[in-house]
Each structure stands twice: as structure tokens, then as C-alpha cells.
Amino acid sequence: MFKTFEMELAGRPLIIETGKMAKQANGAVLVRYGDTAVLVATTASKEPREGTDFFPLTVDYEEKMYAVGKMPGGFLRREGRPGNSAILCARLIDRPIRPLFDKRCRNDIHVVATVLSVDYDNAPELCGMIGASASIGISDIPWDGPIAGVRVGRVDGKYVINPTQEEMAASTMNVTVAGSEEAIMMVEGGAQEAPEEEVLDAIMFGHETIKEICRFQKKIIEEVGKEKRVLTFPEVPAEIEKDVEAFATESLKKAIFDADKLRRDGNIAAAKKAAMEHFAEIYPEHLSDVADALDHLTKEIVRHTITNEGIRPDGRKLTEIRPITCEVGLLPRVHGSALFTRGQTQALSITTLAPMSETQIIDDLTPVTEKRYIHQYNFPSYCVGETKGSRGPGRRELGHGALAERALLPVIPSVDEFPYVIRVVSEILESNGSSSQASVCGSTMSLMNAGVPIKAPVAGIAMGLIEDGGKFSILSDIQGMEDALGDMDFKVAGTAKGVNAIQMDIKVHGISRDILLTALKQAHEGRLYILGKMAECIDKPAEHLSKYAPKIISLTIPVDKIRVVIGSGGKTINKIISETGAKLDVEEDGRVYIASEDEAAAQKAKAMVESLVKEVEVGETYLGRVTRLMKFGAFVEILPGKEGLVHVSQLALQRVEKPEDIVHEGDEIMVKVTEIDDKGRINLSRKALLLEKKNK
């Protein structure tokens, strides 16, 4: 039965409709917020997927170009694979809903958010997140929701929920917060060197509104929600768990606590293999249960030892950061490079500089924009010793690249300060946790090595959380095992002054303000330590660009002179390009960017542009070229497209009968501007200069 529910959210109506669309899904809602409308449908398989050892949840976010009245590009004029924006939005929805499913669930669950209509003030991804929660909540799928998400901005020193496009342009913060009525589940966002206290206040400010949306959803679920189905999960028999614990605890402890990842992984595998062989005869029908018990025991040993003894698998203290080494300028032909190694995580970051014509055009459901700073992250299989083939960047790689880009964007110089398009690629060569934050550190040094005048160095650190028996431990610079077996992955990147980017994912049902505050403070201390290590390698941007980088000169011309520089059919600008070899980009606001690998060529092109737009002034002297001879004088081009007349009486000191007695077409002569009449005609004199020379 069709029903509509409404609440006010940030001064605008939030409407959730049920029972009208996608009625064959387990649960479906249409979320309206302003003129934004997103349909979210959730389905679940009736039976568990056989042979699966993970929870098979898939979230798809489908951007339809008709939602903003655009025609899809390409020959087929049809939406294809999801773009970067859609993938990042899908991740944003996935992360807060995933922890609230039973991790033992093996039924396929598919959440599809389809964007049907968009206005630029109301974010469809937030509607998708609320819709995902509501659609699961009213379905028969067991789940511990609801959750909700909001965006928090900071305008004129005040926090704003779901800022409009105009407010967002003035905001110094852009943080998406998701959570349940009880706790925070996910954080994703950026700021401009914000103090940790401001970031925490923004998160908690957002949570107050999240509570209201969750209560709103609970009313909907009470009224139209289906009865939840009962899922049964295989349990490891208590006897097997007890026997495995007795047999394998000591061997696993010895294997787990080793500073070297590869050796540790090998020792753990050997200990598990020995246990499996031992129990093969005792429990031949329950070997999968034995394997599950071994995995559970490994996790419990790690977590218990950290929270009760303060010892981590590699022997570090809770706040200790792995050894760091840095190197810059490794690659001779690239414009900038740096190698950042932290423990067994290593990132090679390469910077490329290009003319402004190389900006990336972003054409999705948002207004068309251009990006001049691009950060990309690659995670090849060899970095973790695996043999998977390369299939292009996946969701994780796109997410990590976006996080690193957000961390560095606030320190990138403006186009007026540095008129280059900047691309940084982070190649992860080794990974044992925190690779996205290693890419932030490596990219900072690569940018400085390239000579990009960044405003301040940026470093990143990943924090972890272990909750056990009512106690919690915050871990600095988590490694792979701590990420896999822990309860939180909390990435914080910024300068010495404050936070630029933040990302938090959890595996529990939420975390408190106290945990967040402790993690942020500990991250600040770790970030300062890492920045100090980076400064030992490179502490300021290089004074000169690489000799292989393009030399770019910028200047501004009057807007009404743009057509003069371009010329009819591009004739003038193409002439400059052919004569100098430089590349010219002319913007609508009159900014001109000249790029060339040869500095002299760029300067020559600049001089040619300046001569085109220069205004003729009375009293100024010019070297001109004779273009035409008439009975009454000679026409001389003193600037491109600017001709004046030297009357026959002004050609020489003596009387001249015919102009051709003194000059010929093509001759270059010095002339002085004596008058510009009310019709714009320019009168020139050669005689005046000859008199000046004679009288000296």
C-alpha cells in the first residue's frame, strides 16, 4: 500500500515514499529531498551462497543523466559503467550499513540506489544512504539499523547541516557523517587545516540530526515494515573450539608476534596447517569448523594481547610508528618523484606538470567543472605478494585516490600562483597497512621535489581500535593484521596546523565521542612525528622546475582583445604557435597561458601576444613595417593589425616628391605617433625622429 512519510531536514522537507515503486524487491523506497529523488531497492537471496567465507553485500549507485536533463555521451548515448563519482557514492552508502548485518550472513544482498532527479542543493548520495537504510529496514532482511547520513559544512564559523551549493562554496569544511541513533558509524570528508576539536564538533553536530532521521525511519518501519526472516548460521561446536584453543594457542602466539609480515604470515599458516593435520583424524567431518575456530582464535589472541598487555603483533607500543625512510628525485625524466617507506608499506609517488589545456573535465550529475589537481592511486597485486592480473582501478583504489587528493588539495597553489595542471600518481610497491596514507606522504614530497609551491607539507596516518571486555585501545599507524582483526580504520591527514582529510570505517555498531577524541589527539601526535621525518628528506619545494617540465607563462589581456589574439578562424594564434612552437590557451576571462619546453620560445610567444593587445599611444616610438605606398604617403604597421599613415611631408627632413624615393613596401622604419584623431586614425612621423636625432 502506497504511503508517504515526511520530516523537516535542514529547513527542507525530506519525504520517503513506500509501496509505489519496485514492489517485488524485499524493500524499496523513493526518497525525495527538494527536487532530488532517489529510488533505493534492496533484495536478498533466499538461500546462502555455497562455499562462501565472506558476507556477500553489493551496493550499486546508478547515476542517470536524465536526472539533470543531460544526454549521455558516447556513440550509444547510453549510460555505461559507473564513473568515479558513482563508485565513490556507492562506497559511501556501503560503509555505514555493512557493520549492522550479521557478519556470518552468506545470503547475497544487493542494494541499488538509482538517481532519478537531482537539484544541485540536495545531495543524492545522502538520499541514497537514507534510502538504503529505510529499504532494508522495511524489508524482511535481518539488520540492526536504521542509520542515516548528513553533510556538515562550516560557514562563517557556524556548522551547517546539508549546506546548499552556495553555502558549500563558502564552507571551510565538507564532512559526511553517518551513524545510528546510538553512535557514529562512518566519517568521510575534508577541511582546510581544521583543528581536531573543530572536526570532532562537526561530527557530533551532525550526529544530533542523524538521531532525528533514525527516529523518523523507525516510525516508518513500525508502520509498514515486514516481519524479519530468521537466518540460521552454522555454529562451531563448543567442544571443537575448546580443543583447538588448547592445542593451538601457544603455537599461534609464537607465530603471530613477529615484526616481519612475510615471516609472520608463513609461521601462522604453518601453525594452522599443523593444527588441521592434528584434528583431521579427530574431527574428519568438521574440518571447516576447525579452520573457523583457528581463525577466531588468531583474532582473539591478537585483540586480547593488545588490550591487556599493550603488545602489538610486530612488537610496537600502541602509539609507536613503524620505521620511516624517504627519498626524492629517484626518476631522472619525470617532473618530480619520491619514495616513502613506512615499515613494510611503500609508496612511489610521481608528479607530472602540464599546461592548463590538460585539465580534467568532470561531466556527471553535478555542474560541469574542471580539475587541475588529479591524484591517482594504484595497488598492483605484487605489493602484497599475489599474482592477480591487472583489471584497472577498482573501487578501493578510486576511494584511496580520492582520499589522498582531498588531503593535498588545500595546500595546492592557486592557478594564479602556479598555472599548471598537476597529476600525482601513487604506485603502492609494498603494502602492510596504511598505504593510502603512505601515498599522501610520498605525494607531498614528490610535489616539493617537482617544485610545486605547496602551502605546507601534508602527512597521513591510519589509526586503529581494539575493543575487548569493556576496554579499548587506540593504535597508531596500523598494519594489515591490525586492520583486518581490529574494529576501526580511522585515517587522518593534514598539516602541522590541522586536518585536511578524514575517513573512518568501523566493524562494530558504533563508537563514542571519547574514542573519537582519543584517536584524533593520538593521530595529531603521530602526524607531527611523520612530518618531522619527511622534513629530514625535503623541507621545502625545489626552487626550479625540472628541465623536462613545460615552462608556463601567464598573462591577462582585456576580454575585448581575445578575438584579436585568436584571429579570424584562429589564424593569428596559429601563427604564434607555428612561429614559436609554444602552446597557447586563452580563457574566457582573458587569462592567457603559454607553455613550452623552451623558455625562450615561451617568452617570444608572450611578446607576440602583448604586441597584439598593446594600445597605440601618442608620443611613443615604434619600429614599423611599410605595408602600402600612396601618392600622399606611406602606411606603416606599427603593431599587429594597427596601421598608421606617414604623410609624405613627414618622411624625411628634406622635401619629398614621391614616397618611394625614401621607402619601399616591406621596409622597416622607426616612426613616432603624433596624433590619433577622433575616428581612431593614427598619424605617424619619421621626420620628427630625424629632427630629434639632429638636435642632440
State each model region's role.
Residues 25-110, 115-117, 122, 188, ...:
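Glycine-rich, flexible beta-strand/loop modules in the N-terminal catalytic cores of phosphate-handling
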Residues 1-232:
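Long, basic N-terminal domains or extensions that often function
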Residues 103-109, 144-146, 213-231, 262-263, ...:
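Flexible, glycine/charged-enriched surface loops at secondary-structure junctions
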Residues 1-45, 229-367, 550-564, 572, ...:
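Extended amphipathic alpha-helical scaffolds
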Residues 227-238, 529-555, 603-623:
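Long, charged amphipathic helices and adjacent flexible linkers at domain junctions
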